[in-house]
Amino acid sequence: AALEITRKASNSTISQKILFYAKSRRIDFVTHADWKEHQTLLKVHFPVAVHTDEATFDVQFGNLTRKTHQNTSWDVARFESCGQKWMDLSEGHYGVSLLNDCKYGHSVKDSNMALTLIKSGIEPNPVTDQEEHTFTYAIYPHAENWKAAGTVEEAYKLNQPLLTERNTKAGLDYSFAS
């Protein structure tokens, strides 16, 4: 099933197709933004019912954990963390992963997961990110922890989807079986 939403945000237009799958817990948010804002940060937040002291982030050579609380000045200064395809909050036998196909700024505070979608700063270009954007992020609730739940596999499915192409002239030259 799909739900389509279009919103105006100041001078920008954001259209989303929210996809629900019959045989998957993953919910995809296929987003197109015609972004015209100046010095504005667009984030998505997911407050979740997961209580844990650590979040796990995908990074270029594996994964790492970071604290979810802000007990020290160092914690407060770390308002955003880098990550690649996913971040996860898990406790006991339940968790939620936030997957994405091209966004690298994550934040988590207590049980609130967030992903930076667009940052229209002024350096090095005064019109940075003031253009059309298309990206997908997904929320993936799961049992167990991120490893047992297949979060890495779900992130790869999102980032490298199976593509099909209809070709009526292929014949035996392009057959997998011949």
Task: Label each region the model flagged.
Residues 1-178:
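C-terminal (or distal) subdomains of carbohydrate-active enzymes
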